[in-house]
Amino acid sequence: MIKVIKFIFIIYYLLFFQTAYAIEKIKIGLLVPMTGANKEIGNSIIKAVGLAIKDIDSDLIEIYPKDTATKANQTLKSAFELSEMGVKVIIGPVFHESLTYLDEMENL
């Protein structure tokens, strides 16, 4: 009888108290102007996204802002950096001229 109780206890413990899975964090990249004439717009977007994440109240979302400087070549460089970091979701860029070289990015 004691063996049966131990067995039931072990099964109960394994079913309800073990979390054997890993939760992967969601990485979101921001391509915004953080330098140059439009840095105020970029800073506002970073703050707005930060407030939205704070409202969601989740530790599973990480934000990675990168500077575009409102230049196409800097935007491409920042996009490659985000890709190397494993970021799959990107918000931005803000300005149309920053999109010029982004078609070279296949996995974003």
At which residue positions do the language-model features occur?
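Extracytosolic ligand-binding ectodomains
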Residues: 2-9, 14, 20-108
